[in-house]
């Protein structure tokens, strides 16, 4: 007899209903709905609870049709069955079906009514929920709290306050919800009154008050609450940390982060973001590297802070590492990397990101299209940018401005003007301030002065756009490039606002081109008053002094820079080779692994340049070195190093793309023109101002830059 019992216990396929219900619920929760159904079908004896569990399982796995089919097959139903059907439909967004079931119910209790009210609240139909709520024959704590939360979610704080006062028996959830809602609306003191009235507070209540203070710029009050909390969870610590980060108190956040007993992912992400805002990128990277686990937001945040703080190469390396580790980039991450690719002129990686956006069907979005256009423009692929532009029948202002700016930066003034003229005819978009900056820049770069003057005159009279300093800067730049200094000064004198650094900088740049030293000194004085720490002004004026042999003035400027702790921005150039971006600084190849090969290319180019009649321009070089050293130093400029490395590594016929953070120097411009001819290579150089397309010894700028 005992052995038979043991045998049945071991091998019986029938699971007692209570145990089966638990397992059905568990399997449903972890997504194994088909296994749950097999278990349900294997039960010889099914209770109403078994049927209810299986129906709930289908709803939990977003299978409302299967749930309803099983419900209709139930031999017996109780009110729990009906309530489960109403609640399940609501959770699946099937509001109308839920209401039909509710109306058909043979009997209803407070749970039935509450389920329907909660469903309407959950689906954003608070007005309908409110109407039902007041019709309820009876209400319990849950009913009141559900309606309260509905008002709060809908931003109806005053209605929530009135309802809160009517609740006969306020529980912890209702009070905490009210605290959260008031804090969200900035009514922190009222929230604190409710908090102080509570005889018992859960850790959630304490944390809600801490969060509320933090979100309302009262982080010191948040800390006082935090310090007296009877217990703290990971969420409590994280809320306090985020309060510090959101209020820019990064040092306090660092101190708190160090003593946190557990550092959850969300806390680490907040710390990375905070350190990034402060520019502490190395510290942020250490936090990221120390994380035992990371989520999508971790990668997104660390990539974003590197991109925003000018560490584009590191951001790109992180993106590559992310993909190697099998993490799929989120949409914001892809957008950040597109900006990185644009900054670095990394066409290969930009195309990869474009492909990912296409696979996810994000490329149909107008915003994404404008970001892609910008990336291709800055990588020198203007044709691909125009293809994206033409693909959209309905274009927003950003797309129009992007393509006009693209033509401007490539020196294609006529094409830019053509698009500008098409814009009003499209009927949907009117030119704005940015449009005119782009169009006037196009005229300036292309030397189309008369056309630029006409567009400037039409801004306010035809399009109703009042000139701002950016437009004046474009006009001064355009007139100055053309050598029309009197008109440029008249333009400045006519300004209704105070000229800014962009205006004086435009005129100073023109002075360099036309060797107008007297005007340059006047402009530099104005610029130093506005931006005393900007090294560009000192360097440009110093170069002009050097070109005229005024070495005493050069020394005086150097002394002034030293006194004011002004440091020259180092020139840096990038080129993409074998799907990797390589950076070069002036003279900076001593530590390069391919130093010898690069030096050989430089020597070869030096010989070819001399044979082609190249005459080095040493006019801006320092006077305290001999002529041979001056000439030798020129070939180690960052843009020359990048071109040399690209020639070394890229196959014949492949265009060379180089990006420089500063304006290309006149000597390198001349040298690269000749290199493009003697090496029969197209070289695309993007400097701080514009693109230079070198081909067969000519530049697209026509030496008008």
Curated annotation (Swiss-Prot):
Which biological process terms from the Gene Ontology are attached to this UniProt entry? RNA modification
> Is the keyword Mitochondrion assigned to this protein?
yes
Listed InterPro entries: DYW_dom, E_motif, Pentatricopeptide_rpt, PPR_At4g14850-like_plant, TPR-like_helical_dom_sf
| This protein's record includes keyword Repeat | yes
Q: Where in the cell is it found?
A: Mitochondrion
Query: Gene Ontology cellular component?
Result: mitochondrion
Give the region (Type E(+) motif) as residue ranges. 579-610
Positions of the region Type E motif? Answer: 503-578
- In chain numbering, the transit peptide falls at 1-11
Swiss-Prot/TrEMBL keywords: Mitochondrion, Repeat, Transit peptide
Query: Where are the PPR-type repeats located?
Result: 16-46, 47-77, 78-112, 113-139, 140-170, 171-205, 206-232, 233-267, 268-294, 295-329, 330-364, 365-395, 396-430, 432-462, 468-498
Region annotation (Type DYW motif) ranges: 611-705
Main localization of the protein described in the UniProt heading: mitochondrion
- Write one Gene Ontology MF term: zinc ion binding
Q: Can you tell me which family this protein belongs to?
A: Belongs to the PPR family. PCMP-H subfamily.
Q: What is this protein called?
A: Pentatricopeptide repeat-containing protein At1g09410, mitochondrial
| Species for this entry | Arabidopsis thaliana (Mouse-ear cress)
Which gene codes for it?
PCMP-H18
């Amino acid at each position: 007899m005992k052995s038979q019992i043991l045998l049945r216990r071991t091998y019986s396929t029938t699971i007692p209903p209570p145990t089966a219900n638990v397992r059905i619920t568990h399997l449903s929760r972890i997504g194994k709905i088909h296994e749950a159904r097999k278990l349900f079908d294997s039960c010889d004896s099914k209770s109403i609870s078994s049927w209810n569990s299986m129906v709930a399982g289908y709803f939990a796995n977003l299978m409302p049709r299967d749930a309803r089919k099983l419900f209709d097959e139930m031999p017996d139903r109780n009110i729990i069955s009906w309530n489960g059907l109403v609640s399940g439909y609501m959770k699946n967004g099937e509001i109308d079906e839920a209401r039909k079931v509710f109306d058909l119910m043979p009997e209803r209790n407070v749970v039935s009514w509450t389920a329907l009210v909660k469903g309407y609240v959950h689906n954003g139909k608070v007005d309908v929920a409110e109407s039902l709520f007041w019709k309820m024959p009876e209400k319990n704590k849950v009913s009141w709290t559900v309606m309260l939360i509905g008002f709060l979610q809908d931003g109806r704080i005053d209605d929530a306050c009135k309802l809160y006062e009517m609740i006969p028996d306020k529980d912890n959830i209702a009070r905490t919800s009210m605290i959260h809602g008031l804090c969200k609306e900035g009514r922190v003191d009222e929230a604190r009154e409710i908090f102080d009235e509570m005889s018992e507070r859960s850790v959630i209540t304490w944390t809600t008050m801490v969060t509320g203070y933090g979100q309302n710029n009262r982080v010191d009050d948040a800390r006082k609450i935090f310090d007296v909390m009877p217990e703290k969870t990971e969420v409590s610590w994280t809320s306090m940390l985020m309060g510090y980060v959101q209020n820019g108190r990064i040092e306090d956040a660092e101190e708190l982060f160090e003593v946190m007993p557990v550092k959850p992912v969300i806390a680490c992400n907040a710390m990375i973001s905070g350190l990034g805002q402060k520019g502490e990128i190395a510290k942020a990277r250490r936090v990221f590297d120390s994380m035992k686990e990371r989520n999508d937001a971790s990668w997104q945040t660390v990539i974003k802070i590197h991109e925003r703080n000018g560490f584009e190469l590191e951001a790109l390396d992180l993106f590559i590492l992310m993909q190697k580790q099998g993490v799929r980039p989120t949409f914001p991450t892809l957008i950040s990397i597109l900006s990185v690719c644009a900054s670095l002129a990394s066409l290969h990686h930009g195309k990869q990101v474009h492909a990912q956006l296409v696979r996810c069907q994000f490329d149909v979005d107008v915003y994404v299209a404008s970001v892609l256009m910008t990336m291709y423009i800055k990588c020198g692929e203007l044709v691909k940018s125009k293809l994206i532009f033409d693909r959209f029948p309905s274009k927003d202002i950003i797309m129009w401005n992007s393509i006009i700016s693209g033509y401007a930066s490539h020196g294609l003034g006529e094409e830019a003007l053509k698009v500008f003229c098409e814009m009003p005819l499209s009927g949907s978009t009117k030119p704005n301030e940015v449009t005119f900056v782009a169009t006037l820049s196009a005229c300036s770069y292309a030397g189309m002065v008369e056309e630029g003057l006409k567009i400037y005159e039409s801004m306010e009279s035809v399009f109703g756009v009042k000139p701002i300093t950016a437009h004046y800067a474009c006009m001064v730049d355009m007139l100055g490039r053309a050598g029309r200094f009197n008109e440029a000064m008249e333009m400045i004198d006519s300004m209704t606002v105070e000229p800014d650094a962009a205006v004086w900088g435009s005129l100073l740049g023109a002075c360099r081109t036309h060797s107008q030293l007297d005007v340059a000194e006047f402009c530099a004085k104005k610029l130093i008053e506005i931006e005393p720490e900007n090294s560009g002004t000192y360097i440009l004026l110093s170069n002009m002094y050097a070109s005229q042999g005024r070495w005493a003035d050069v020394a005086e400027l150097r002394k002034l820079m030293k006194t004011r702790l002004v440091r020259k921005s180092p020139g840096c150039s990038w080129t993409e080779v074998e799907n990797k971006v390589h950076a070069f600084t002036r003279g900076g190849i001593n530590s390069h692994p391919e130093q010898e090969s690069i030096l050989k290319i430089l020597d070869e180019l030096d010989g070819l340049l001399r044979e082609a009649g190249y005459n080095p321009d040493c006019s801006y070089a320092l006077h305290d070195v001999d002529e041979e050293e001056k000439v030798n130093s020129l070939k180690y400029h960052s843009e020359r190093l990048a071109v040399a490395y690209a020639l070394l590594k890229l196959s014949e016929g492949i265009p060379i793309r180089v990006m420089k953070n500063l304006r290309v120097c006149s000597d390198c411009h001349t040298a690269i023109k000749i290199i493009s001819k003697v090496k029969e290579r197209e070289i695309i150089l993007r400097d701080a101002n514009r693109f230079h397309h070198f081909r067969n010894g000519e530049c697209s700028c026509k030496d008008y830059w």
